[in-house]
Regions:
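Metal-dependent nuclease catalytic core centered on acidic motifs
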Residues: 1-51, 68-249
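Conserved catalytic cores of phosphodiester-cleaving nucleases, focusing on short active-site segments
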Residues: 58, 63-69
Length: 249
């Protein structure tokens, strides 16, 4: 099995474990108590597909969970710009530190810090990312001719750069340190058009410990709620710190 497949399996298993550990009724929208308990049962029994390269990623009795990542940074054919540049930055930082360590005096403590600003993030980017990847995985579902009765898309928000402020009518605003899809009425209307193909949407962000579950057929009732929503990009820096000492052999 290739390293890429092993890495992907690890990501999918970690995402599934996050759902199992953090699934609670307050994070579910449009689900009855019975449907919530059913979802818990499915998640507990779910396993990675033994055919790693085939649809779907995760299976359970008469059902599937298909996992994919979404981003609020810009994307191109190579994927999310933030993820790619972060990987390059980390690798280059490690290389520079090791070079400095190699040229240092014996038993001299070497400490290096490397800093770069985050890429630009936006609400538009994450909506486009969700739509693009959703359509792609709908295509995989249709090609697979999968006949499962229970169908779930598991989206993983890969960044922490969009925060959400939700203000219900006549109430104070609540701030969430992640993108909250349950308040994105325009996108939910679009997702609702796939109600005959996918039953549940789960959006997770393990970094901000955020999880939302939406029963897609219940979306019309969700978007009737009178709320005001603001999605705000968060600006910051990515940093790496290294400490080491070249000792005598």
């Amino acid at each position: 099995m290739s390293e890429n497949i092993l890495n992907q399996d690890s990501i999918e298993q970690t995402s599934l474990d996050f759902v199992k550990s953090n699934l609670h009724k307050e994070a579910c929208f449009g689900l009855s108590d019975q449907q919530f308990n059913q979802l818990k049962t499915w998640s507990k029994s779910a396993k990675l597909n033994t055919h790693s390269t085939k649809f779907p990623d995760i299976v359970f009795d008469n059902g599937f969970i298909e996992h994919f990542g979404v981003t609020s940074s810009s994307e191109d054919k190579k994927g999310a710009h933030q993820v790619r540049e972060s990987s390059i930055f980390k690798k280059n930082s490690e290389t520079r530190f090791l070079n400095n360590l190699e040229t240092s005096e014996q038993d001299e403590l070497v400490s290096n810090s490397y800093l770069r600003p985050f890429e630009q993030h936006s609400h538009i980017n994450i909506v486009e990312s969700i739509k693009k990847n959703w359509v792609k995985h709908i295509g995989s579902y249709e090609k697979s001719m999968n006949s499962s009765e229970h169908r779930i898309f598991l989206l993983q928000y890969l960044d922490t750069n969009i925060h959400t402020a939700i203000t219900p009518k006549n109430e104070c605003a609540e701030i969430f340190e992640s993108y909250m899809i349950s308040a994105d009425k325009s996108l939910l209307k679009w997702i609702y058009t796939f109600k005959e193909k996918i039953d549940y949407l789960i959006l997770i962000n393990p970094v901000s410990i955020s999880l939302e579950v939406i029963k897609i057929s219940s979306i019309p009732a969700l978007i009737e709620k009178e709320i005001e929503v603001i999605y705000t990009p968060i600006f910051g820096f990515e940093s790496h710190r290294f400490h080491g000492m070249k000792s005598s052999k």
